[in-house]
């Protein structure tokens, strides 16, 4: 049984595919005053945690982020065991897994001209990516959050990490309300996806076309539509019913995504409105992320 308390040391384990943004994530945690260590072998995690807890004079770092690399790892499935040991010792452990589509990874390697870590095995780049997906499958299964960075630039990824994972949060469920454009794909990390394309589109109003769903003109237009009001009422009823079921301690993060054609008006409006509703209902850890806007 875990002995984690709200004031417990925090350990973020950063894992995932090479080229998916792990280095950006670790640098972001470092910028947020986390003590960071990269490429730590899994079998050293227990000693790492013990050294963290052994220093009782207050000088030991309370927030750490550790990068786990696929190279040289004998058995990545051990992560669950080491994670439980850390939790039993009173450390608040979170596992993040970063990934991207094959097409995105191939383009990133072409742009940077860097070699894939598994290329030393004589594999082509597509083969190395496929092999790494197989090797890291145990890490992905263990993750509290899977973050697909295919559509994110460095600045967007940094902002997302800061918003979701580095702020001091009360214990409980972290809620992210996200907007997206269907033409760029559904967010892979979404737990719930709602289609806003059935609603009236402000794009066809010349006075609203250049605005986003965060601006008063678009909000007023959508809130005046009976279909939007009915859609909102049904969404609120659904989320009010089922989000508490996910906040019983079995989940750490939930992403609720809203999609429309361009990710600019309807989906943004819904994400902002439902985030506001969640705060009004007493949820403390609520954030928004507009994939096509931020």
UniProtKB/Swiss-Prot annotation:
Family: Belongs to the RapZ-like family.
Lineage: superkingdom: Bacteria
Function: Displays ATPase and GTPase activities.
Protein name: Nucleotide-binding protein Smlt1108
Keywords: ATP-binding, GTP-binding, Nucleotide-binding
Entries under PANTHER family matching the protein: RNASE ADAPTER PROTEIN RAPZ
Binding site for GTP: 69-72
Phylogenetic lineage: Bacteria, Pseudomonadati, Pseudomonadota, Gammaproteobacteria, Lysobacterales
Pfam families per UniProt: PapZ_C, RapZ-like_N
């Amino acid at each position: 049984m875990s002995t984690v308390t709200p004031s417990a040391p925090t350990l973020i384990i950063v894992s995932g595919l090479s080229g998916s943004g792990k280095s950006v994530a670790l640098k972001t945690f470092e910028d947020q005053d986390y003590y960071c260590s990269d490429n730590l072998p899994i079998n050293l995690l227990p000693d790492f945690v013990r050294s963290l807890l052994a220093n009782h004079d207050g000088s030991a770092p309370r927030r750490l982020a550790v990068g786990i690399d696929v190279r040289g790892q004998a058995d990545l499935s051990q992560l669950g065991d080491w994670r439980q040991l850390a939790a039993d010792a009173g450390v608040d452990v979170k596992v993040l897994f970063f990934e991207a589509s094959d097409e995105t990874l191939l383009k990133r390697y072409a742009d940077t001209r860097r070699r894939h870590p598994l290329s030393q095995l004589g594999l082509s780049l597509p083969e190395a990516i496929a092999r790494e997906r197989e090797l890291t499958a145990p890490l992905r299964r263990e993750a509290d959050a899977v973050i697909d960075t295919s559509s994110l630039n460095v600045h967007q990824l940094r902002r997302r990490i800061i918003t979701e994972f580095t702020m001091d949060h009360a214990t409980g469920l972290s809620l992210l309300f996200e907007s997206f454009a269907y033409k760029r794909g559904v967010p892979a990390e979404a737990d719930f996806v709602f289609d806003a394309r059935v609603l009236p589109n402000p794009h066809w109003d010349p006075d609203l076309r250049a605005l986003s769903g965060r601006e008063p003109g678009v909000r007023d237009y959508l809130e005046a539509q009976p279909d939007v009001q009915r859609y909102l009422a049904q969404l609120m009823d659904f989320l009010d019913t089922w989000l508490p079921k996910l906040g019983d301690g079995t989940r750490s993060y939930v992403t609720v995504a809203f999609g429309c054609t361009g990710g600019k008006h309807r989906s943004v409006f819904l994400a902002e409105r439902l985030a506001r509703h969640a705060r009004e209902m007493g949820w403390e850890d609520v954030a928004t992320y507009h994939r096509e806007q931020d």
